[in-house]
Amino acid sequence: MPDNLKETWEDQGKKNYYSDRFSGYAIFVSNDNADRTGSLAFGHSLGQELQKRSLHYTPHYTFALMGRYRHELVDADAGVYRYDQLIVLRRTLMPAVLLEAGSIVNRQEELELATPERRLIVADAVTAAVENFCANRGQTVAGRSASKPGKRRKYRALQRHQAGVALPLICELRR
């Protein structure tokens, strides 16, 4: 968030910055990723799952006033933006997305993001997106073949929670 869009308030003698103008999630992908198509497909699925749970994406990354923080919206249906400079997105050999689950400079959204309920909503959306992605690609997240031809395949995303935070999701083949 550019400094010119932030406002200040003092709380217990400490200066804080905020901007209540924008709220919502954002999903980022890189055109330089080795599996750009897979990244876009997963980003689309993730955005759709978040929207099914009544979350909305933030459009502010497309505004000129964002300056160097401005990003091209590549999937307006799902809230997926292009972010080529981010190493973790562009240098991986597998599909990759970055999920910004909300805007913590928005005071109300920061409070919502801190609740176990909101974390669970986001974790459930990520889980469903991983399940859909694995099922549609016929492979595990690691890129291995899913099973022997002719066998019925079922996929399940496993999710573990520790202190209310979702840990990495693993796509597992179930026979």
Regions found by a protein language model. Name each.
Residues A157, H161, A166-R175:
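Long, low-complexity, intrinsically disordered segments
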